[in-house]
Amino acid sequence: MKVYIIDYHRDDPKKCTGRKLIKLNFAELTRYGKGIILDPYSKRILSILDKDIALKTGITIVDTSWNSTSKIEFEKIKGEHRRLPILFAGNPTNYGIAYKLSSIEAVIASLYILNEVEEAIKIANIIKWGHTFLELNKELLESYRNKSENEILEIEREVIEKIIGEP
């Protein structure tokens, strides 16, 4: 599955996981959205129903700082926008924070959800904390894997209810 990176050059170059994916030939740099655009502001959620699109046209990650990106910037990118369901960062900067994944964690999660588990594990192996991310989210990733959008939304709702203690 092709992975594309749009790099806004707002991250610390030493910590930029998108550039690492490009350097190690796991992703290709692009200036335009292709296929599925991972967008944290999207109302639609990535699911197995998106696999055909991802196989044909790829997945695009916008590599930028969480502190300097707005919804408007994502809206300008053409493609099929999808967000990831609740997952917890395994990276040292945002460890344990829901939804605040690095670019490489977003790629790993996307591949896992789309049932490309071997490729997800292969990419997790290129960073020290890749397996931390997988272990931290193992149960969630397995529950999202191969599921429809509605099924994932229901699982996510249940997880959030457990976290905030609502019935």
UniProtKB/Swiss-Prot annotation:
InterPro entries reported in the protein's UniProt record: RNaseL-inhib-like_metal-bd_dom (IPR007209), Tsr3-like (IPR022968), Tsr3_C (IPR007177)
Top EC class, one word: transferase
GO molecular function annotations of the record: 18S rRNA aminocarboxypropyltransferase activity; S-adenosyl-L-methionine binding
Pfam families linked: Fer4_RLI, Ribo_biogen_C
Function: Aminocarboxypropyltransferase that catalyzes the aminocarboxypropyl transfer on pseudouridine corresponding to position 914 in M.jannaschii 16S rRNA. It constitutes the last step in biosynthesis of the hypermodified N1-methyl-N3-(3-amino-3-carboxypropyl) pseudouridine (m1acp3-Psi).
Name this protein carries in UniProt: 16S rRNA aminocarboxypropyltransferase
Keyword Coiled coil: no
Sorted UniProt keywords: Cytoplasm, Ribosome biogenesis, rRNA processing, S-adenosyl-L-methionine, Transferase
Keyword Endoplasmic reticulum: no
Subcellular location field: Cytoplasm
Cellular component per GO, a single term: cytoplasm
Similarity comment text for this entry: Belongs to the TDD superfamily. TSR3 family.
GO biological process: enzyme-directed rRNA pseudouridine synthesis
Record-annotated disulphide pairs: none
EC number annotated for this UniProt entry: 2.5.1.157
Residues reported to bind S-adenosyl-L-methionine: 17, 62, 84, 99, 103
Reactions catalysed: an N(1)-methylpseudouridine in rRNA + S-adenosyl-L-methionine = N(1)-methyl-N(3)-[(3S)-3-amino-3-carboxypropyl]pseudouridine in rRNA + S-methyl-5'-thioadenosine + H(+)
